[in-house]
Amino acid sequence: MRLGSRLAVDVGKARIGLARSDPHGLIATPVETVPRDPAGSADVRRILAVATEIDCAELVVGLPLALSGRATASTDDAEGFARRLADATEIPVRLVDERLSTVSAQGALRASGRGSRKQKPVIDQVAAVIILQHALETERAAGSPPGALVPRNRVDPDRHA
């Protein structure tokens, strides 16, 4: 298992959930929910600020695939966002399969007694925790980093497609 804190990113249409691991990769905890900024780069800047605050060794972006494994519009959105992150930082960015993370997060919150109205502010953070915990467990079991490394094409984070 590689050492260093990881920051998980659950990309949604309106919000982005963040979760972090401890430096030993044993546990994932929620951090915050960042508003999506489709017209600018405030979301990328905030995520990179959090990554700097926690001395992040790697960013783990959830890749929402259909149950069949096929790409969806959400898959394309997450891949594009991961590229924006990779282009704006030296921190490695990985895409990891996140099938059913939001469904699992909803179930966990429901089981904890949170109704759907109370879930909204934290659902994205809980999904990010599930994504990160899965990535950490996968790395421990396989002995290699999970998912796929996103290639970097350095650009100004304020300039994106």
Curated annotation (Swiss-Prot):
<dbReference type="InterPro" id="IPR037027">
    <property type="entry name" value="YqgF/RNaseH-like_dom_sf"/>
</dbReference>
<keyword id="KW-0963">Cytoplasm</keyword>
<dbReference type="GO" id="GO:0005829">
    <property type="term" value="C:cytosol"/>
</dbReference>
<dbReference type="InterPro" id="IPR012337">
    <property type="entry name" value="RNaseH-like_sf"/>
</dbReference>
<protein>
    <recommendedName>
        <fullName>Putative pre-16S rRNA nuclease</fullName>
        <ecNumber>3.1.-.-</ecNumber>
    </recommendedName>
</protein>
<comment type="function">
    <text>Could be a nuclease involved in processing of the 5'-end of pre-16S rRNA.</text>
</comment>
<dbReference type="GO" id="GO:0004518">
    <property type="term" value="F:nuclease activity"/>
</dbReference>
<dbReference type="Pfam" id="PF03652">
    <property type="entry name" value="RuvX"/>
</dbReference>
<keyword id="KW-0690">Ribosome biogenesis</keyword>
<keyword id="KW-0540">Nuclease</keyword>
<comment type="similarity">
    <text>Belongs to the YqgF nuclease family.</text>
</comment>
<dbReference type="InterPro" id="IPR005227">
    <property type="entry name" value="YqgF"/>
</dbReference>
<feature type="region of interest" description="Disordered">
    <location>
        <begin position="141"/>
        <end position="161"/>
    </location>
</feature>
<dbReference type="GO" id="GO:0000967">
    <property type="term" value="P:rRNA 5'-end processing"/>
</dbReference>
<keyword id="KW-0378">Hydrolase</keyword>
<dbReference type="InterPro" id="IPR006641">
    <property type="entry name" value="YqgF/RNaseH-like_dom"/>
</dbReference>
